[in-house]
Amino acid sequence: NITIEHSIIQNDILLNRRIEEYLSSRCGFYEIYTYPWIDEKYIHAAKIDISKSLKLATPPAPSLAYLRSSLIPGMLEAIAKNLRYYNEFKLFEKAEVYQKGDYRPSSNDEILPVQSNYLTGCIVGKNAKEIFYEAKGVIENMARYCHMENIKLEKIEKPNYADINAYLNVTKDDKIIGSLGLLSVQVMSDSKIKRTNVAIFEINSDK
């Protein structure tokens, strides 16, 4: 006999739809889509150790040789581009990231990078305190609206991109699964993000 069960994948699809609806319809975010290969300068700008990123054998361009291990670099690039036209905006992206690992889905001869689903979002505006607390509220309310398992916001470990005085970690079952913070002055400078403030968050949605 074959038993058909409602799979975890179906639940994931429903959760993703809830998150999209919540961020776009209720919070005023616009969804963006970026390529999996990232401009090297934004990897450095995000203060990510590039040695932990996967390098492509045949990149589409010399500066696009690395696969993203985080969605933050792509979001930095999107912010810099959008600031040419807008002073205030909110963006989000849901996508896979690729990390070095030893993932063998079907045979020992086939070694693939470890792939994880991440969610990132940003609020860009002049008032740093206001956008930080708005982003904090977005995450807190997302858990309730999307029927997600309880997540908490705690100050444990500063993310590399964040200002030393304005960050929080997203935790679940006492484990860090994401972060929220204002971009540091150095990260904004290296990303050519000028005359504004940015609150940004990133969550591993597989955890």
Regions found by a protein language model. Give the residues of each.
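Extended beta-strand-rich architecture
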Residues: 1-207
